[in-house]
Amino acid sequence: MSTTKQTGDASLYMLDHEGCLHKKIDHVTNSNGICWNATASLMYYIDTPTKKVLAYPFDNTTGNLGAPTELIDIETAGIEGSPDGMTIDVDGNLWIAMCHGGAVIQVDTQTGKVVKKISFPCVETTACTFGGAH
């Protein structure tokens, strides 16, 4: 994350098992919501100010990323707030916390469509996760 929050000043890095850093994505501002599908073949990624969720083909052996595709543009979808923290459920759907939007949305990764929105009585919704025995 850029400490001055200047657009494009930051990068996303990977720390490998030997402790070496590798730059993976340039020209980002605020990396958020990084998660993988069940087979670790796709990495979902948010650079919050873009209000987009990108899907990168991912090689779990090398850590290499392929060319991204846009899964959803939050602004175009008419969702209030900025995408922040994100997790994935057992069905492969993304759950995205909407900072300044007071909600968590569920996005179908096959269609890129919002299938559910859960509103909260707080504006700064920044993270979501699942817990429990199952």
For each of these PLM feature ranges, what is it?
Residues M1-L12, L21-L42, I74-L94, C122-H134:
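Beta-rich, blade/repeat-based domains predominating
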Residues H17, I105-K116, V123-E124, T129-F130:
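Flexible "stalk/tail and boundary" regions
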Residues M14, A55-P57, Q106:
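Conserved blade-register residue in beta-propeller folds
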Residues G19-H22, M43, K51-V53, T62-A67:
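Short, structured loop/turn "capping" segments at alpha-beta junctions
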Residues K23-D26, N64-D73, K116-S119:
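Beta-propeller fold detector
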Residues S2-A10, T48-K51, C99-H100:
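Short, solvent-exposed loop/turn segments at conserved positions within beta-propeller repeat blades
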Residues Y45, I96-A97:
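Conserved beta-strand element within WD40/beta-propeller blades
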Residues Y56-N64, T109-T111:
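Short loop/turn segments immediately following beta-strands, especially the blade-tip
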